[in-house]
Design a protein with these regions (language model features):
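Extended, charged low-complexity regulatory segments
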Residues: 1-168, 653-656
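Alpha-helical nucleic-acid-binding subdomain
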Residues: 66, 75, 200-449, 456-464, ...
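Phosphate/oxyanion-binding active-site loops and adjacent basic polyanion-contact surfaces
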Residues: 154, 158, 188-192, 317, ...
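Conserved acidic
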Residues: 154, 313, 515
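Conserved helicase motor core of SF1/SF2 NTP-dependent helicases
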Residues: 206-209, 218-261, 433-448, 455-656
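A general structural signal for short secondary-structure junctions and capping/turn motifs
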Residues: 46-51, 58-61, 102-104, 111-113, ...
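Amphipathic, well-packed alpha-helical segments that form the structural scaffold of globular domains
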Residues: 163, 167, 171-174, 197, ...
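P-loop NTPase Walker
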Residues: 1, 5-8, 12, 16-27, ...
């Protein structure tokens, strides 16, 4: 199998070398050569990414047919069956979905773990009820091994251990909007990223136009950044809303004004700001020609009717006015020439046109049919001159000024609703909305969009997403129990209906693979408060009972450092996280907390996971933001093994 793999890689490398050496004469040939080189280089990257753990499974059918399952497909022309089946292919479906109740024609599902190119471990599941034979290796579930493994600070693929409810969503044929609701640890992010890889494989539009993965923050995107490349997919863009808009916010918006700026009413308000700068009233006067409000209104309607962004529509407006002025100048020129002819004829008794024609005939020239004084007016030259005339440009600018997105947003808040200082995170979708009004749709759109932590998006951020996915092919994953302070929607229907109507499929993940029974039990009352109608996830693992320390305010930092040092000594090599109110991160960083653990502000903890988590001052986290209870819920569910909370109260230290 690896022999064929090496052969294919060598072939692609040779093709790339030949393309790069090929001469290219002219821009078109250079473009085509570069395009071919980029395609081949991407193919090489896909092969390289798939080499590690290339094969991870095998299915043995009851009729004896065996298929190996891996990160990519390999086919030899002389063989009827593929050497390796891509995990996204239909033939791989039984590997993920077969059960003892419905074995889907399989006798055995085999999990393989490679060390380099050598099989390091084998585990078999007998699915048809038959007895295990000497060829079967039955042990702990590969999922159990993965769940018990230490965290690394980066998410890995779950391509070998996707569970049936997850896999069904990943492979859903629905090309519209797929929504995945699930509590902490249910694998929402895993589903989202593997869904992106599947979309590239199965949906031609996604493969042609690419996939966008939108995450809540840069920390989260760094955490998941290696998943898709390790699945062999490089045609995926990972971004935050800020990166999509090309804006770097430098201040944090207060919660209440963030909710206002996130509301859909702001879209109409921004559109009105632009509309008021599109020749709502006024006349246009250049070169002695005056166009009244009626003519200007016709020009405005023609420009607006194109559906172009304000600045491109401005050129249509300008050209329409210039055409009207050119027509007026031509009429004036004709009237002037006719008046001169009439005055000369009256004074001399001569018809100048007839006299000129007679003279031309005497000289041997033929009279041009239909010639007149109007033929001497070069309308196209006049039109071009007007388009380049600074006076015309100034007159157009007064009626239909060139705009920037920044100017539109600042004009919206000129009444004092918001400070006009540096941009905040809540300003980003407003700037993007304004950019679409001013310059038209974004330059880059995608065939499929995946949004993680989608419950975080405001109405204005949803508009950002939809603009970049004209086909409305999206996978959205989240949990409204973890929603932040700017979110006003209470459920998926409320969030999505304005953009896609009822055209979305809702799936619910019910099993928590990351969080233990004991940890989920500590969050049950909190979940009831923040999401009364939401059913708790069911954990499949048991672990340590969470501990609580109670300390005085003056002793909280020292207690935290002592706890981290103790955990570090008892569990060397494991990944520790400290989650605290955002306002305390600077102080704790200065105290040296990052020597022992990752320091995470509560507002940034969504989507992350650690072996052990220490939540510092739960009451402080609750009080820090409007969504404080939800932030605390997120923080308490980040651990895969151990949870410790340090409560800060006036009483002396206790431990439970």
């Amino acid at each position: 199998m690896y022999g064929l793999f090496d052969e294919r890689v060598a072939q692609v490398r040779a093709q790339l070398a030949a393309v790069l050496k090929a001469p290219a004469d002219g821009g078109r040939e250079v473009y085509e050569r570069d395009l071919a080189a980029a395609r081949l280089a991407g193919e090489i990257r896909r092969y390289e990414a798939a080499e590690s753990g290339m094969v991870f499974g095998r299915t043995d059918a009851a009729d004896g047919t065996a298929l190996h399952i891996g990160r990519l497909g390999l086919h030899a022309e002389e063989l009827e069956l593929p050497l390796l089946v891509d995990w996204r292919a239909e033939a791989a479906r039984p590997f993920y979905e077969a059960t003892a109740v419905d074995p889907m024609g399989l006798r055995r599902r085999r999990h393989l773990r490679l060390e380099g190119r050598t099989v390091g471990a084998v585990n078999d599941e007998i699915l048809d009820g038959s007895e295990a034979t000497a060829d079967d290796v039955v042990g702990d579930s590969p999922l159990t091994e993965v769940l018990q493994a230490r965290r690394t600070g980066r998410m890995g693929t779950a391509v070998a251990t996707l569970q049936a409810e997850q896999h069904a969503i990943v492979r859903s044929p629905h090309r519209g909007v797929t929504v995945v609701q699930g509590g902490p640890g249910t694998g929402k992010t895993v589903v989202a990223l593997h869904r992106a890889a599947y979309a590239l494989y199965a949906f031609p539009r996604a493969a042609e136009r690419g996939v966008l993965v939108l995450g809540p923050n840069a920390r989260f995107l760094d955490y998941v950044s290696q998943v898709l490349p390790s699945l062999g997919e490089n045609d995926v863009v990972l971004a935050t809303c800020e990166e999509l808009a090309g804006v770097v916010p430098t201040v944090t918006e207060p919660a209440e004004s963030a909710r206002i700026k996130g509301s859909s009413e702001l879209a109409d308000a921004l559109a009105e700001v632009v509309r008021q700068r599109q020749a709502v009233r006024g006349e246009f006067a250049v070169q002695g020609v005056r166009l009244g409000e009626r003519e200007v209104g016709r020009a405005r309607d023609a420009a607006v009717g194109t559906g172009l962004g304000h600045n491109r529509a401005r050129q249509v407006f300008k050209e329409y006015l210039v055409d009207l002025v050119t027509d007026a100048l031509e009429r004036d020129a004709l009237e002037t020439l006719e008046r001169i002819d009439a005055e000369v004829a009256e004074a001399t008794g001569l018809d100048l046109d007839r006299a000129a024609a007679a003279d031309l005939r005497k000289l041997g020239f033929e009279e041009a049919a239909g010639s007149s004084a109007a033929d001497e007016f070069d309308a196209e030259a006049v039109r071009e001159g007007l388009l380049e005339d600074p006076q015309v440009e100034r007159a157009v600018e007064e009626l239909w000024p060139t705009l920037t997105a920044e100017a539109v947003v600042r004009a919206l808040f000129a009444s004092g609703v918001s400070q006009l200082g540096p941009w905040s995170d809540a300003d980003v979708p407003l700037l993007d909305e304004a950019a679409s009004l001013v310059d038209g749709p974004p330059a880059r759109t995608y065939g499929h969009v995946v949004v993680d932590e989608a419950q975080e998006l405001t109405a204005m951020q949803w508009r950002m997403v939809v603009r970049r996915c004209p086909a409305r092919s999206m996978t959205l994953v989240g949990d409204f129990a973890q929603a932040g302070p700017a979110t006003t929607a209470r459920d998926w229907g409320e969030a999505l209906t304005p953009h896609v109507g009822a055209r979305f499929e809702l799936h619910t993940l019910t099993v928590s693979y990351r969080t233990t029974v004991e940890i989920l039990a500590t969050t049950r009352d909190l979940l009831t408060r923040i999401a009364p109608g939401q059913k708790p996830s069911s954990a499949i693992r048991r672990g340590e009972v969470p501990r609580t320390l109670t300390v005085t305010p003056d002793g909280s930092t020292a207690a935290l450092l002592a706890e981290l040092q103790d955990q570090h000594a008892q569990h060397p090599g494991e990944l520790l996280g400290v989650i605290c109110a955002d306002t305390r991160t600077e102080e704790l960083h200065a105290a040296g907390v990052t020597r022992w653990a990752h320091l995470i502000p509560a507002s940034q903890a969504r989507g992350l996971e650690f072996d052990g988590v220490v939540v510092l001052d739960p009451e402080g986290i609750e009080a820090a933001r409007v969504s404080g209870e939800r932030d605390l819920y997120v923080g308490l569910t980040r651990a895969t093994k151990r949870l410790c909370t340090i409560a800060v109260r006036q009483r002396s230290s206790e431990s439970t």
